[in-house]
């Protein structure tokens, strides 16, 4: 069974994110940032939908810039689930994920700690790096908000075990941050 790839590589002309090979895709969001707005399904919906089946793959063929963005989101969802393991309810989970989204400890492509630097083109200039940081921060904030809605069917209860069971899995045998690093 092949991995699920992003439909945005074939359906949409994907804008490059600065001078890198990641895609700058439109998203549905209320958070401020450089991402174009849309009212339709976006890369975040796709990443959340394909997270569970794709997390089991050790290899993933990148077919375009939208796939690179989706890979980053899958890595980030895993970090979010690790954070949610300690959350007693939805409000605490939202606070934890908002703090994680704004964290400067999360590496971006081109930095030393990023796990797939060989497959991602680093930003060539400071404006490209700033645009990438702002875009990734915006999608991290949005994915945290949507993941809380999915992981907490009851806002007063702990997160769903059907999401938390994936917190220990490692996509492509890698993680966004090294093992043992607490965010």
Swiss-Prot record:
Keywords: Actin-binding, Cytoplasm, Cytoskeleton. Belongs to the ARPC3 family. It is found in: Cytoplasm, Cytoskeleton. It comes from Caenorhabditis elegans. Gene3D superfamilies: Actin-related protein 2/3 complex subunit 3 (1.10.1760.10). InterPro entries: ARPC3 (IPR007204), ARPC3_sf (IPR036753). Component of the Arp2/3 complex. This is Probable actin-related protein 2/3 complex subunit 3. One of its GO terms (biological process) is morphogenesis of embryonic epithelium. GO terms for cellular component: Arp2/3 protein complex; cytoplasm; striated muscle dense body.
